[in-house]
């Protein structure tokens, strides 16, 4: 549709482990149970990089240190054509963490900088705090994680899936609740909840 220019490919948000001990009533969108941690963006716009690389989070380890509650994990940039049985690792960042004060903080190790065009000054502006060490991706860390105000024991556990349309259905006018979208209609279209 050509409404937008090239955009960098990005992963879904990588999310934390469930912080409650019960699976009853589990909802991935419940922020009291699961937190967004970070996601990756390709450095180049368009879909070329998206077809060449994939990202794996490996070596996830909870902290065993009483003085440092932050666990560690590794990030692997892999060839998109490889398999888990025979991985082809292009770049590897070992023992990174989510502690903004650490030298192994994921943003410091991989980098989070990107360019954006500023019409006022008519030039590109560098945004982000840490130069990119990766040749392929930059990381975007969720704001509360970057400020150090989230639970220090959080570790990457999964990711949100792609967006999808909300389900919907038809309801007869005689069955419609009082707050339906239209009144007096014999067929009312409303989202299913």
Residue ranges and their predicted role:
Residues 1-193:
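Subunit-assembly interface segments of extracellular/virion macromolecular structures
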């Amino acid at each position: 549709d050509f409404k937008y220019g090239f955009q960098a490919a990005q992963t879904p948000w990588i999310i934390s482990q469930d912080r409650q001990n019960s699976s009853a009533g589990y909802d991935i969108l419940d922020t009291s149970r699961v937190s967004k941690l970070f996601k990756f963006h390709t450095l180049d716009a368009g879909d070329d990089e998206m077809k060449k690389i994939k990202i794996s989070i490996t070596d996830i380890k909870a902290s065993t240190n009483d003085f440092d509650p932050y666990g560690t994990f590794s990030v692997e940039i892999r060839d998109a054509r490889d398999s888990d049985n025979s991985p082809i690792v292009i770049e590897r960042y070992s023992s990174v963490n989510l502690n903004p004060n650490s030298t192994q903080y994921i943003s410091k190790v991989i980098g989070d900088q990107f360019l954006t065009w500023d019409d006022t000054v008519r030039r590109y502006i560098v945004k982000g705090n840490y130069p990119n060490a990766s040749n392929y991706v930059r990381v975007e860390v969720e704001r509360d994680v970057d400020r150090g105000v989230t639970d220090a024991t959080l570790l990457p556990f999964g990711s949100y899936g792609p967006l999808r349309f909300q389900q919907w259905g038809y309801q007869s006018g005689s069955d419609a609740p009082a707050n339906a979208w239209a009144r007096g209609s014999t067929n009312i279209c409303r989202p299913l909840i």
